[in-house]
Amino acid sequence: MPKTFTQIPLTRPNTPLLDTLASPADLRKLPTPQLERVVDELREYLLYAVGQCGGHFGAGLGVVELTVALHYLYHTPDDKLVWDVGHQCYPHKILTGRRESLTSIRQAGGLSGFPKRSESEYDTFGVGHSSTSISAALGMALGAEMAGSDRRAVAIIGDGAMTAGQAFEAMSHAAHTRSNLLVILNDNNMSISHNVGGLSNYFARIWASKSYIALREGGKKVLSTMPAAWDFIRRTEESMKNMVSPDMLFEAIGFNYIGPIDGHNVNELVSTLRNLRDLEGPQLLHVYTTKGKGFAPAEADPVGYHAINKIEPKPKVQVAVPSKPSAAKQKLPKYQDIFGQWLCDMAEQDPRLVGITPAMCEGSGMVEFSRRFPGRYHDVAICEQHAVTLAGGLACENQKPVVAIYSTFLQRGYDQLIHDVALQELDVTFGLDRAGLVGEDGATHGGVFDLAYLRTVPNMIIAAPSDENECRQLLYSAYQHEGPAAVRYPRGTGPGATIEQTMTALPIGQSRTLREGLQVAILAFGAMVPAALEAAIPLNATVIDMRWVKPLDRDAILRAAAQHTLLVTVEDHQQMGGAGSAVNELLHEEAVVLDVLNLALPDHFIHHGKRDVLLAQAGLDAAGIERQIRERLNRQQRLREAHQR
């Protein structure tokens, strides 16, 4: 049995056997009985390393045994392991030469929190979004076949990710190609099936045994010349499986289903994988695991321990704490909390409101709504396409759907947004969470493309609140609009604005001027408003909180263009196609000739690190905004002087 820990070690644990493993090749030299010790040392080191820097926690703890068994049986990196989503990849990184760097994970300049091809040859496919592993692994299996190689490909996918359509699309194709692909279903909350009792466990062991597999494969070859006999045997086998397992779905698709087996018994995993490794055709191994395995608090609260912050050691000397913390130290609500509170308040007023989320209840702030309004709450699992079209169908029946979705995940439902919502002018409100840079989760989770892909869609309106109160009011404004609307807001807390409980519909397409200045006008969008205001003071610049990206406040922009010599747009979005591009288009349409400076994210993927650090590196903090404006003003002055000469 693996060890269970109750505390996260604050000092590096003693891991003598793990320390000898520089690569999976070293792991494969060990006798099988030593793997249990490797498992315990790896899990303890994982607890320590994540405690040092913070990061995804429960998923990695749950696949320690599986990770060890896979690298022990498969000749990685020649054999390909594809981890779905990637939250569970930390043990994999520890075993593949990155053990001592793990304390830098998700930090600027450190390891990525997800598998990343440029980081290691063992990271065979970059991930972050869910349900892509089977497609990628199948592509690798087909590529190996075309090259005449016997390399193996394995996709490791969780039960949540298995609910997405792409996973089944890939499995259907794999069954058609009959490629040598192993899919491991890592089932850590029994959402796929719930097999109970000794009969189920008994048959699961039989189906995973070497003798049964050999008998099955040999019989298939012999009986292939006698179709009637083989059909009878196959139907008998299926009937036996169906008595004790509801997972006939995978057999019906065309996979040989094995399991379920205990994902925390490393010896059973090794034995089963050894039996499966050389089989021909698509195989599915179903393993049961516990998220947070080996750390008692995480096993008791897997949702709360999905990820953790850095563990700070307690100071030896007690520091006096003020009886009344300053306003700066008071805990500010996150934008997700503001959305969740607005959703509940709005639902109390309007019985037509329906909340929809694709498996992001906690992250999107919908827990309270799900408890208070269970009949009007739909978690559709990792099915973004379905979420959007479901909302469209509800709108057809005079309901008022609100879809809470991360900006980066709405990309998956783009066709549905155009075809099933916007084209039909259906009344659907989208709460776009994690808009802009997200920080430690990196490029896979950045919401930096939404303005570009949304503002091209007819009938769509887009709001970008600058603070907590504006977020609440713009959500209300979007909800009151009879048509598709999106409100984008960042991860985490805002500047600390007082939130008015009264909800007021703000005029669509109307900005507000926050500061009057000379020469320079800054058109700030969303979360960039506070930094723009700070930069404007030494510049004596005008600052306009634009509020809306579509429609733009044309009058305010043209007025600012007429009264200033430099127009500056600031946004936490890719420059191409973003809000600045929209302003440029408007000025071009109106034949306005003016110097315009577009400050936005550069044309490359921005990787992981603290959000404020990444914004500063992109020149989107107050100092960077001021510096770039001064550089442009100096350039204007040089051009004027050159013209005068």
UniProtKB/Swiss-Prot annotation:
GO terms for biological process: 1-deoxy-D-xylulose 5-phosphate biosynthetic process; isopentenyl diphosphate biosynthetic process, methylerythritol 4-phosphate pathway; terpenoid biosynthetic process; thiamine biosynthetic process. Coiled coil: none annotated. GO terms for molecular function: 1-deoxy-D-xylulose-5-phosphate synthase activity; magnesium ion binding; thiamine pyrophosphate binding. Homodimer. Keywords: Isoprene biosynthesis, Magnesium, Metal-binding, Thiamine biosynthesis, Thiamine pyrophosphate, Transferase. It comes from the Bacteria. Catalyzes the acyloin condensation reaction between C atoms 2 and 3 of pyruvate and glyceraldehyde 3-phosphate to yield 1-deoxy-D-xylulose-5-phosphate (DXP). Pfam families: DXP_synthase_N, Transket_pyr, Transketolase_C. PROSITE patterns: TRANSKETOLASE_2. Pathway: Metabolic intermediate biosynthesis; 1-deoxy-D-xylulose 5-phosphate biosynthesis; 1-deoxy-D-xylulose 5-phosphate from D-glyceraldehyde 3-phosphate and pyruvate: step 1/1. Disulfide bonds: none annotated. Binds 1 Mg(2+) ion per subunit. Binds 1 thiamine pyrophosphate per subunit. SMART domains: Transket_pyr (SM00861). Its cofactor is Mg(2+); thiamine diphosphate. The lineage of its organism: Bacteria, Pseudomonadati, Pseudomonadota, Gammaproteobacteria, Oceanospirillales. The keyword Iron does not apply. This is 1-deoxy-D-xylulose-5-phosphate synthase. GO terms for cellular component: cytosol. Its EC number is 2.2.1.7. Belongs to the transketolase family. DXPS subfamily. It catalyses: D-glyceraldehyde 3-phosphate + pyruvate + H(+) = 1-deoxy-D-xylulose 5-phosphate + CO2. It is an enzyme of class 2 (transferase). Mg(2+) binds at D159, N188. Thiamine diphosphate binds at H87, G128, H129, S130, G160, A161, N188, F295, E384.
